[in-house]
């Protein structure tokens, strides 16, 4: 979410430079920076997806152990651990 706000702020700054009549060289440099940043973010998302496939069993086990210590049942979904009380007691 913070990344989207950052990119939105940079877009607003870019539009401000364009409205102020700055040279296109500045805009071209900013566009190149945005392009590189976008590529890095997309590469990071790809890496995170690859790591999540490997990390899920460890996180699931941690979640189960964490909730078991509270005498609850653990459910891990999208890296979010939820402890649920089963039964009527």
Swiss-Prot record:
It is found in: Secreted. Its main location: secreted. One of its GO terms (cellular component) is extracellular region. InterPro entries: Long_scorpion_toxin_alpha/beta. The keyword Methyltransferase does not apply. It comes from the Eukaryota. Residues 21-39 form a propeptide. Pfam families: Scorpion_toxin_alpha-beta. Disulfide bonds join 56-76, 63-81, 67-83. Residues 1-20 form the signal peptide. Expressed by the venom gland. Residues 53-89 form the BetaSPN-type CS-alpha/beta domain. The keyword Signal applies. GO terms for molecular function: potassium channel regulator activity; toxin activity. Keywords: Disulfide bond, Ion channel impairing toxin, Neurotoxin, Potassium channel impairing toxin, Secreted, Signal, Toxin. Inhibits voltage-gated potassium channel. Belongs to the long chain scorpion toxin family. Class 2 subfamily. This is Neurotoxin beta-KTx 52.1. It comes from Lychas mucronatus (Chinese swimming scorpion). The lineage of its organism: Eukaryota, Metazoa, Ecdysozoa, Arthropoda, Chelicerata.
């Amino acid at each position: 979410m913070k990344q989207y706000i950052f990119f939105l702020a940079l877009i607003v700054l870019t539009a401000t430079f364009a409205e102020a009549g700055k040279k296109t060289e500045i805009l071209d440099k900013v566009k190149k920076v945005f392009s590189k940043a976008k590529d890095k973010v997309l590469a990071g998302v790809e890496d995170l997806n690859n790591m999540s496939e490997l990390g899920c069993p460890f996180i699931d086990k941690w979640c189960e152990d964490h909730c078991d210590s509270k005498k609850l049942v653990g459910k891990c979904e999208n890296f979010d651990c939820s402890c649920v009380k089963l039964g009527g007691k």
